[in-house]
A protein has these predicted regions:
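Active-site-adjacent betaalpha module
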Residues: 1-97
Length: 97
């Protein structure tokens, strides 16, 4: 069985039970992508860093209504707490498992 959680806040980890499910399965690495970079992606990365996860933001799988904000976050803010990767990087890593 897959774990299915409902998201009620911008942050995908807060109040969803996802953190508990991940820890129960000894999962410490999170690959984060989505819309909007300035919303769910940023909020989830910040909270995930506080929870000591290893974070990977998939740059080419994130977007924002403001391209300048997206670029600023990807290049200046998110790298402080996450590794910025491409979808190609993720595919290669998964194939190597």
């Amino acid at each position: 069985g897959e774990v299915v959680v409902g998201k009620h806040r911008v942050n995908a980890l807060y109040g969803t039970g996802l953190d508990v499910a991940l820890r129960a399965n000894d999962i410490r690495d999170l690959v984060i992508l989505g819309y909007a970079t300035s919303g769910v992606v940023l909020s989830t990365v910040r909270y995930g860093a506080d929870l000591d996860y290893n974070l990977y933001v998939v740059e080419d799988c994130c977007s924002d209504s403001d391209a300048e904000v997206h670029d600023f976050l990807i290049n200046r803010i998110l790298p402080r707490q996450a590794d910025i990767v491409t979808s190609e990087d993720v595919i290669k890593a998964l194939e190597a498992l």
